[in-house]
Regions:
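Glycine-rich beta-alpha loop elements in corrinoid/cobalamin-binding modules
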Residues: 42, 61-260, 267-268
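Conserved, mostly hydrophobic/aromatic
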Residues: 171, 282, 316, 320, ...
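Flexible glycine/acidic-rich beta-alpha junction loops that bind and position SAM and/or redox cofactors
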Residues: 90-99, 147-149, 179-184, 211-213, ...
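Flexible, glycine-rich loop/tail regions that form catalytic "lids" or insertion modules at the edges
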Residues: 27-31, 73, 201-204, 296, ...
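Conserved SAM/AdoMet-binding glycine-rich loop
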Residues: 29, 45, 59, 65-68, ...
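N-terminal pre-triad scaffold of radical SAM enzymes
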Residues: 30-35, 298-324, 357
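N-terminal [4Fe-4S]-dependent radical SAM core
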Residues: 2-24, 34, 235, 239-309
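Terminal amphipathic helices with adjacent charged low-complexity linkers/tails
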Residues: 66-67, 196-249, 262, 271-274, ...
Length: 653
């Protein structure tokens, strides 16, 4: 194990600058997350990228925004700009539940403390910096700013908000994965350009006077409905989102313009997807993969989750309506080379507390590595936000062969016992049968490889609902495909003598979901022998099609009306059906079903109910502790022929 010195981390204090003999830095990054020097943490990625290009970079993690602002003063002024990177999650999702209740833990803070970040740190940090150093440019990045780059609905304020540049008074947003635009910005500022004159860097957002918008270079413009129009007309807001989503996922996107008062928000098209060499260069930077030494003895929950995981690609072509990944990373997959992946795995193997098991070898989705369009010219003209919904594109290469090779190459390394897959598996890709028989054989081979060797007892998948009308709104495959995959999963388990569980994820209160749909979900999952635990109430987050439908009441593509459960009472009534098996929920559910006129479902949920036998509580508690990911069962939930007894559950191999 390599011993790291304090100077192996990016500096966070004046003392650490002195150790490097630096009297000044080029860029200072302010982050609302703890500083973890790991490629899964955005501030570390940008900091290491700039460092590799020869710039001096410092990070101020979780500054105190109260009192005399000493954390904002301690490193002085940077030569080029302040970067505000609020964190890996939207701050309001991080702090509050779907019912707007304060969360008890912040996964990105030491010991899970929830008082170390403000609401909207993008705005709070920027306003402080502008107050202290009005002449120094402030550049925003990260998920919070990226998803608020245009007029958006804010669930926690329950109103539309303009581009976050208007509220924060920052100079620029770098949206999405920011290595390339950040490097280009540094280069321009280094050459003496004023940030107000830099208007042509891809993947940036800035405000211009409405009567003096710079001419687009090499692209067309799409003029969106103004912020003021959207405030008055929800349909206009819905119309905007179709353009926003399409331009976020095109090979050759248009520039977006939106008027806000006397200003115009200008969103430049994104950079093309990174090449494999470029992505390798980002992941191969000298990360220590450790929290900064200032956190010694403290637990950072998010780091513990990804400590022994390795990311193998960027991008996701699933296009799920409630997900921000396509708007942030795009739908085109960029893969790391096998050599780069193995290099990082070897680094994990050297960690002193690594016991031989990788917790995840995946990405935004588990099984999209190596996939993309066969005919690239067709992809260049494509406007679909998803390559697999409503049907899998016939141009998509769904061959899993490269991914199988990655798994086997990793498992062959000395020091690796098992590599598990913690990312969500797209079972629709596994079930799909194309005209390419080699790809079909690889899908079958991958499915067996996955279940036999890469499941740590429980496999996570995300059907999200059972009602096809809701699944269409979510852009998820029909529920029958989940049934088909579960049957395949159970068959392979039986053939291999395994006793694994499949853990389905579900969402309530999604646009298009009525209470009766949730009642049907309860009955169907009960018939499949699930006691659901991995569930969530839909939370409207900025810049997703689901949020736009929830707020406006319109489908942004068809402009047809869409129902959404909005009041807390409606949302709780939908959520209760997840927990039909809890005795304390039965009376309320029965009352709700009768009010719906669906008393027939009562018998389906509780027919032949009998007292469960007393469990061995020692074993039961142990099982519950292991089973934080979902189905709270003490036995496996495979489908069995009538009359066949359930096999006893066996712990993880």
């Amino acid at each position: 194990m390599k011993e790291y010195r304090l100077t192996d981390f990016l500096p966070t204090t004046k003392k650490e600058l002195d150790l490097r003999k630096w009297d000044k830095v080029d860029v200072i990054l302010f982050s609302a997350d703890a500083y973890v020097d790991h490629p899964s943490f955005g501030a570390a990625v940008i900091g290491r990228t700039l460092e590799a290009a020869g710039y001096r970079v410092a990070i101020v993690p979780q500054p105190d925004w109260h009192g005399d602002f000493r954390d904002f003063k301690k490193l002085g002024k940077p030569r080029l700009f302040f970067g505000v990177a609020p964190g890996c999650m939207d701050s309001m999702v991080n702090k509050y539940t779907a019912n707007r209740r304060l969360r008890s833990e912040d996964a990105y803070s030491p010991d899970g403390r929830h008082d170390l970040r403000p609401e909207y740190p993008t705005i709070v940090y920027t306003q402080i910096l502008k107050q202290l150093y009005p002449e120094v440019p402030v550049v925003l990045g990260g998920i919070e700013a990226s998803m608020r780059r245009l007029t958006h609905y804010d669930y926690w304020q329950d109103r539309l908000r303009p581009c976050i540049l208007c509220d924060s008074h920052a100079d620029m947003i770098i949206y999405g994965m920011g290595e390339k635009p950040t490097l280009e910005l540094c280069k321009r500022l280094d050459e003496g350009y004023n940030i107000g004159d830099i208007t042509d860097i891809p993947q940036t957002v800035y405000l211009a006077d409405s009567n003096d918008v710079p001419t687009a270079m090499g692209t067309t413009d799409i003029v969106l409905n103004s912020h003021e129009t959207c405030m008055k007309d929800k349909r206009a807001e819905a119309e905007n989102y179709r353009h926003i989503e399409e331009e976020s996922n095109k090979m050759h996107a248009s520039r977006l313009l939106q008027n806000v008062g006397r200003k115009t928000v200008v969103v430049n098209p994104p950079y093309p997807p990174m090449t494999t060499d470029e992505l390798d260069a980002s992941f191969d930077l000298p990360y220590t993969r450790l929290p900064h030494p200032k956190y010694k003895g403290k637990r950072i929950p998010a780091y513990e989750m990804i400590k022994f995981s390795v990311n193998i690609h960027r991008g996701c072509f699933g296009g799920c309506a409630f997900c921000t990944i396509s708007a942030h990373q795009g739908k085109f997959i960029t893969c790391r080379s096998k050599e780069s992946i193995l290099k990082e795995v070897r680094q994990v193997i050297e960690m002193p507390d690594f016991k031989g098991n990788l917790s995840d070898l995946g990405g935004p989705s588990a099984n999209m590595y190596g996939m993309g369009g066969r005919n690239k010219k067709a992809c260049e003209k494509c406007t679909r936000p998803s390559c697999i919904n409503p049907q899998i594109c016939p141009n998509l290469n769904t061959d899993h062969s490269k991914l199988i090779d990655i798994y086997r190459s990793v498992d062959a390394l000395p020091g690796i016992r098992r590599s598990y897959i913690g990312s969500g598996v797209r079972y629709d890709l596994l079930l799909y049968r194309s005209k390419d028989e080699n790809a079909n054989r690889a899908a079958a081979e991958y499915t067996r490889e996955l279940i036999e060797r890469h499941v740590s007892g429980r496999l996570k998948v995300a059907p999200e609902h059972v009602a096809d009308n809701v699944l269409r709104q979510m852009r998820k495959p029909p529920f029958q495909q989940f049934r088909d995959f579960k049957r395949l999963f159970d068959r392979i388990n039986g053939e291999c003598g395994l006793h694994q569980q499949i853990i389905p994820y579900f969402i309530s209160s999604h646009p298009g979901c009525h209470e009766e749909d949730m009642a049907e979900l309860a009955v169907i999952t009960k018939d499949l022998d699930f006691h659901l635990e991995q569930v969530q109430d839909f939370t409207p987050t900025p810049m997703t099609i689901s949020t736009e439908a929830w707020y406006t009441g319109y489908d942004p593509y068809t402009l047809e009306p869409v129902f959404s459960a909005k009041t807390q009472e409606e949302k709780l009534r939908q959520r209760q059906y997840f927990f039909w098996y809890k005795p304390e929920m039965r009376r309320d559910i029965e009352r709700s079903l009768r009010a719906l006129g669906r008393g027939d479902l009562i018998a389906k949920l509780w027919n032949n109910t009998q007292q469960r036998p007393t469990l061995d509580m020692t074993r039961h508690k142990s099982q519950q502790a292991k089973n934080k990911n979902g189905n709270n069962r003490t036995t496996d939930n495979r489908e069995r022929p009538k009359g066949q007894k359930r096999r006893p559950y066996r712990n993880d191999r």
